[in-house]
């Protein structure tokens, strides 16, 4: 029968519940007009199938007048199609409230309210809500939360450092891994895990200007962190009172900040939880004076609780510079340089003794005496066991010494020697004749290192005489690419102009499919270029990158690198090779270096190869050698006789070998053990790879996409294209792009195809979609027909989902202890709870949908019977809720008590444990337990099942 509509009646939209209560304005022929006063919206509906539900309250319900006062309904009259409610107000006085005067802002979000208001959802949505609760709970309790969802290969030492640091309250540490070991990824993991856990909510990243873009790409591509890049232009153009307050993550160039006092004032006023400083070894400090950059970072470190400093290794820095970084972290502990030097000297024999134990499995009398003097009498029994060959005692001894390490808690430093998995490098050099066109060029700064730039900058260079038509390196490159057919080749050169010209040359002279990558391209253009290069079937054979353009990118699916020219600094050379030379690279790195004979290019090649050995190995001494020999090197590149040049090469080689020996003897194996995690990181890697192999996420996401009206279609193997459909339910679904996106659940695919979104449980699309499910009301009611021969037709079962809810700051991380897992209750007609015998999935398989109108009619007819049964469900579930809260309190107390005991014992032997850490942990324990005491039981969803 058609609905009877009267002006003034109150109805609610089934599809737009957020509009509040609607008022019927008019019925005109086949159209119905409804006003939603709360939002000011008007809707017109086809009369026959308007998606509306009549709002009808019952005795016992609490309702609100539009002026704000409330009443409890006792009776309901129907006067000419309009409802009039009679009942008691807050002062227990008899009042009358016509439905026309109901509050416009009433929304039916509580499951019971929506059920009895006729807002009944599809079965699929009820299942989606249940599974969302289960998956959310599982992730909040996972030890991988914040570590497993990153677009990077899981690497043991990085994961160990990230978990160790990110799980501290306001961590203050120095990340000083050798080049190529992934300090930026370690910092990103710490930031990501701290943000997800709630330990930090505002992060400030300070970097040198030339690294801003690299950080931006890394944070967005790897961690899905939307970092705001600040410079002078953005700061000035912002309309905000304080531009820094508008962003959660700010990326700022240190050079600009030092020169802009107004920006400094705004930065300090904004307030931050975590400060990250890259290239911290460039902050100059001396006992009598500090640079402006150092002083600024020092002031920030005084007011920001957490600090991460990314820096070169201590051995590269030298002791004084190393001390300068440590005093930024803890000025109370590291306040005296001379005392620090003495402490370091005293500790050196202990580190050497540990080295002996690790190498030989036993201790010499001298090493025994050294460790005994360090540990005192308490270490005697342990040393005796070690000498008796007890391997467990040896491991325990190393842990004891580690705890007493002067900087073991604040300094993490891994070396390539300690971390396995790096590929071998092979060098292929190609001396080529220097063309006359270059020989005739006037000399200038680096003119003969990059002669093509100088040549092309001349006026009136004709198209047919462009540099790439006569430069022998171009002919050589074409021949080399033909020889390496079907092999991916990365070409790097110093300048963007050279990269673009080379792409032209390959297209005109060879037809070899190539793409280019330079700093003039935006991120989307670079993504497309990288994707074209990564495509095995139809992609480019060669990617040509400029120096700056390739920063922050990972091309390790390739293992052939062409250095079309050589950079002027060894650090830049290492960065180039580092695009391919990474942990996880499965092939030998083939380095191809063409250079022009009898030119500065040839001399620079000799410098890097013969003096620095920078092609075949990493060169940790390169910066120091460049600083020492640079003033002599540059003039000799262009003008020197062979004897003078060879003398420089020999002198630099000898100095390099001396410095490398110093580095080796200065290695602190104990510190390396601590930084590497001694096996803990390996376990995390295994857990992440196991999680990657599970199908729970793709299965869940398909149901999420279906529910929200997102179309998915195959793109290629392991990849899908997502697009909003015409029936998209919620425009706020975090798809990322209204035009659609390409996604993959496969980590290896995501690493080679940066244009694809890597979907994990931590991805913003997943988290945002789950938030939409749980924050909305869809799926918290359902009615279904149950087909089960054991049930008498007409039998009504009631399935109730409850959640133990605690309202607390995210920084307390109470979700780890009391996650929102559903407490499920399945009541039969006699009030018995069958949930222990019938699982959710078993029940789900027996259910069929019921037309909405029929379901609504049934609910209204059964309202008086259902209401007391719903109330009885809470009584049934309350003991389980109490057990869950008690268990959460026990686990929280046990975890914090264990950590407090560990840190208290550690503080007795290692002063780098700050009092503030212990105070914060005790406060967190007290607050967490107090909040858990207030945990409440909330009815999350109701499903009514009718046997048929």
From Swiss-Prot:
Any GO molecular function: hydrolase activity, acting on acid anhydrides
Alphabetized Pfam families for the sequence: Helicase_C (PF00271), RapA_C (PF12137), SNF2-rel_dom (PF00176), Tudor_1_RapA (PF18339), Tudor_RapA (PF18337)
Gene encoding the protein: rapA
Protein name: RNA polymerase-associated protein RapA
Enzyme class, first EC level, given as a word: hydrolase
Coiled coil: none
Superkingdom classification of source: Bacteria
Gene Ontology biological-process entries: regulation of DNA-templated transcription
Helicase C-terminal domain mapped to chain residues: 473-627
Entry EC number(s): 3.6.4.-
UniProt cross-references to Gene3D superfamilies, sorted A to Z: 2.30.30.140, 2.30.30.930, 3.30.360.80, 6.10.140.1500, 6.10.140.2230, P-loop containing nucleotide triphosphate hydrolases, Tandem AAA-ATPase domain
Domain Helicase ATP-binding per the UniProt entry, residue ranges: 164-332
Extent of motif DEAH box: 278-281
PROSITE patterns: HELICASE_ATP_BIND_1 (PS51192), HELICASE_CTER (PS51194)
Residue positions binding ATP: 177-184
Lineage: Bacteria, Pseudomonadati, Pseudomonadota, Gammaproteobacteria, Pseudomonadales
